[in-house]
A protein has these predicted regions:
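A glycine-rich helix->loop->beta "capping" turn
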Residues: 5, 54-57, 76-90
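Structural signature of the Rossmann-like NAD(P)-dependent dehydrogenase/reductase core
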Residues: 11-12, 90-91
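Conserved glycine-rich Rossmann-like NAD(P)H-binding loop of the short-chain dehydrogenase/reductase
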Residues: 29-46
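Aromatic pocket-lining residues of Rossmann-like dinucleotide-binding sites
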Residues: 26
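Conserved glycine-rich cofactor-binding loop
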Residues: 8, 15-17
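The beta1-alpha1 cofactor-binding region of Rossmann-like NAD(H)/NADP(H)-dependent oxidoreductases
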Residues: 41, 62-76
């Protein structure tokens, strides 16, 4: 039983560095993880597979966090796909 079982996290910029480390840690604690990326579809797909290896749900969304309309759309899409957002990490 993980600290974040049943929670949904949205993390911006999680295909590398701190964002990816946070995504993997949250997944290891039981959170489903939605995350954004800007350029590399391949890196996003690798990250999805790494997160899913923890037995949780993962989905990548291409989005520029600096663009308000795109950020708004991602929030709506994540809520539709996951039902809610419990944790937000703006990386």
């Amino acid at each position: 039983m993980g600290l974040l079982d049943g929670k949904v996290a949205l993390i911006t910029g999680a295909t590398r560095g701190i964002g990816k480390a946070v995504a993997l840690k949250f997944a290891s604690e039981g959170a489903d993880v939605a995350f954004t990326y800007l350029n590399s579809y391949e890196a996003a797909e690798r990250t999805v597979r790494e997160i899913e290896a923890y037995g949780v749900k993962a989905k990548a969304y291409v989005s520029n966090a600096g663009d308000f309309a795109q950020a708004h759309d991602v929030v709506k899409d994540v809520q539709a796909e996951f039902g809610r957002i419990d944790i937000l990490v703006n990386n």
